[in-house]
């Protein structure tokens, strides 16, 4: 419950892994798994993130979600606070960025189960993240969920300081 007595809005915490390559900032984005996302690309990619309970520290949740979705622990190092954004459906995403490197070919995501095909009565298991990829900031802005694009701009500003 929120302090006002109502239900707390859904909140997610995420961690953007970034690196500088050839003078350009690159970010590691993830693509959601499952049949509903299989043919979507532009606007479908995201930072590794997930919901967390009210009693969990958001940065700890971001690090946990990174490990769950990529199968690799979040890198140690300074976490740059990128603030919050509100997604279209109202979910608030708080994010941090950490410098590091990860080979996208090595990711192993946690999974989820859903009925597929719809109304078939059969369930299938799918990876929460079906792939990860490094993008320069300009291409990342085209691929990422539009509500999360502000996080990329904040990262650019933080790195340029």
Language model regions located:
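Alpha-helix-centered segments that form part of catalytic cores
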Residues: 122-138
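Short, solvent-exposed loop/turn elements at beta->coil junctions and helix N-caps
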Residues: 3, 80-87
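Short, charged/polar surface micro-motifs in flexible loops or helix N-caps
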Residues: 22-24, 34-37, 53-54, 89-90, ...
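Residues that scaffold the ATP/ADP-binding catalytic core of kinase and kinase-like folds
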Residues: 39, 55, 143
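Active-site-adjacent beta-strand/loop module that shapes the phosphate/pyrophosphate-binding cleft
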Residues: 84-121, 133, 155
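The catalytic Nudix box helix
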Residues: 47-82, 136
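Charged phosphate-binding loop/patch that engages nucleotide di/tri-phosphates or the phosphate backbone
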Residues: 133, 137-161
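N-terminal strand-loop-strand
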Residues: 2-47, 96
């Amino acid at each position: 419950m929120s302090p006002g007595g109502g239900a707390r809005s859904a909140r997610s915490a995420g961690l953007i892994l970034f690196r500088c390559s050839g003078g350009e900032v690159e970010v590691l984005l993830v693509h959601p798994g499952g049949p509903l996302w299989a043919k979507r690309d532009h606007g479908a990619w995201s930072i590794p993130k997930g919901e967390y309970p009210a009693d969990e520290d958001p940065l700890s949740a971001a690090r946990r979600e990174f490990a769950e979705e990529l199968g690799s622990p979040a890198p140690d190092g300074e976490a740059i606070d990128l603030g919050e954004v509100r997604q279209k459906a109202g979910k608030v995403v708080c994010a941090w960025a950490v410098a590091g490197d990860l080979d996208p070919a090595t990711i192993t995501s946690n999974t989820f189960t859903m009925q597929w095909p719809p109304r078939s009565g059969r369930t299938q298991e799918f990876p929460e993240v079906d792939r990860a990829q490094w993008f320069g900031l300009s291409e990342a802005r085209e691929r990422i969920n539009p509500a999360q694009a502000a996080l990329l701009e904040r990262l650019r500003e933080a790195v340029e300081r």
